[in-house]
Amino acid sequence: MSNGTGGRGQRPVFTDQEALLFHSQGRPGKLEVIATKPMATQRDLSLAYSPGVAVPVLAIAEDESKAFDYTTKGNFVAVITNGTAILGLGNLGALAAKPVMEGKAVLFKRFADIDSIDLEVNSEDPDEIINCVKLLGKSWGGINLEDIKAPECFIIEQRLRELLDIPVFHDDQHGTAIIAAAGLLNALDLTERDVKTTRLVCNGAGAAGIACLELLKAVGFAPENLILCDTKGVIYQGRTDGDRKSVV
C-alpha cells in the first residue's frame, strides 16, 4: 500500500516499507525526553534532585498552583486513547494506537512548542478510563483525548470535564469540528450564502460528525437545515436501529 500521488497540493508519496523505516530508524518511535536545566555539575544534580528538589516540593504542598511555576505542568499535555477508533482503521487496541499518539505529541511540539506524553489505556470500559485519567490528572496542564469510539467518547469527555480542573479536549470531536466550521463559513462567504438558510448534509454520525453539527448549530446553522446520516441512512427522532443520538 502506498500513500498519495505526489505533486503540489497532493499527499506525499511513500510506501509501507518507507513508513516503517521512518518509525524504526535511529531511536525507534518519535519522542524523547530532554532536560530543560543544566546537568553538568554535582551542584546541578543536587538542585534537580535531592536535596534541592525538596524546596519546590514543600512550596507545592503548601499551594498546588505553584506546580505551574516549578514543574512542567503548565506546558504539559497528556494525549490519551484506548485505540477503539484509530484513524480510519477501527478498533485495533490500545498499543496499536501508540504511533498515532506519538505523532500527535510531536505535532504539539513542532507547531506550538507544547510538551506532551502519550498514554494508551488498555480498557474499553468508560468508567475505568475516566478513573484512570482522573487519578493521574494532576500531572498535566491539559488532556487531549483521541481515537476513542462513539458513544463512549462523549461520556468520557463530559465526565472528565466535570471532574478535572484542567482543559479536556477530544480531538476527533472538537478539532475536526473547528476546521469544518471554519471551512464552511469561508465557503459561504465566498459564495454569498446565508448561514441561516443554507442546507447541509453530514455523511457520518460518529464523534466527528456529531460534533461538527453541534458546532455548526452554534455558529448559526438552523437545526432544521442539517441532515445527519450514518450507514443505515438519515438519523431522525424515533428511529430505532443504531445507537447514534439525534442532534438535529
Walk through the language-model features, giving the residues of each.
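Glycine-rich phosphate/diphosphate-binding loop of Rossmann-like nucleotide-binding domains
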Residues: 87, 92-112, 164, 170, ...
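Acidic, His- and aromatic-enriched active-site or binding-groove loops in soluble protein domains
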Residues: 173
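N-terminal ligand-binding/catalytic initiation module
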Residues: 2-167
